[in-house]
Amino acid sequence: MYPLEVVTPEGIVFKGEVEQTVINTADGEIGILENHMLLLTNVVPGKLRIEIPEEEPKEYAVTHGVIDVRGDKVIVLVEEAFGISEIDVEREKRLLEEAKAKLEERETLSLEEIENYERMKERAEILLELAGVKVR
């Protein structure tokens, strides 16, 4: 068991002793157990699963951020984290359509705008998939 904190700009989403944390990183899905080697890496949108002995796993949808695995503690710092059942499917569909429409006009966009709409599209697609909506 080890202490885990999941933090967003709005505050602490989860804080407690856990057995395992499973999260998507830029290098793929990783599982963190007690005494994991030190690690600092980027988190990508997807599912965060927190396993606590004798409880059902807690699952969250998370967006971009970082995970900091220290010898005695794990901190997940992400832009957003919320229960999968809390995903606003209609809102995410609208954001996906908006991003796709803007990206079709990419000649008129700056590189920064293109990157922002790509992130918006990726985020919406992943959150919709986590909510059980087929988008691809």
Curated annotation (Swiss-Prot):
InterPro entries listed in its UniProt record: ATP_synth_F1_dsu/esu (IPR001469), ATP_synth_F1_dsu/esu_N (IPR020546), ATPsynth_dsu/esu_N (IPR036771)
Pfam families given in the database record: ATP-synt_DE_N (PF02823)
Keyword Signal found: no
Keywords: ATP synthesis, Cell inner membrane, Cell membrane, CF(1), Hydrogen ion transport, Ion transport, Membrane, Transport
GO molecular function: ATP binding; proton-transporting ATP synthase activity, rotational mechanism
Membrane topology summary: Peripheral membrane protein
Entry's localization field: Cell inner membrane
GO CC term, one of those recorded: plasma membrane
Record flagged with keyword Transmembrane: no
Purpose: Produces ATP from ADP in the presence of a proton gradient across the membrane.
Assembly and interaction partners: F-type ATPases have 2 components, CF(1) - the catalytic core - and CF(0) - the membrane proton channel. CF(1) has five subunits: alpha(3), beta(3), gamma(1), delta(1), epsilon(1). CF(0) has three main subunits: a, b and c.
Protein family (similarity comment): Belongs to the ATPase epsilon chain family.
Protein name: ATP synthase epsilon chain
Protein species of origin: Persephonella marina (strain DSM 14350 / EX-H1)
Organism lineage string: Bacteria, Pseudomonadati, Aquificota, Aquificia, Aquificales
Name of the gene encoding the protein in the UniProt record: atpC
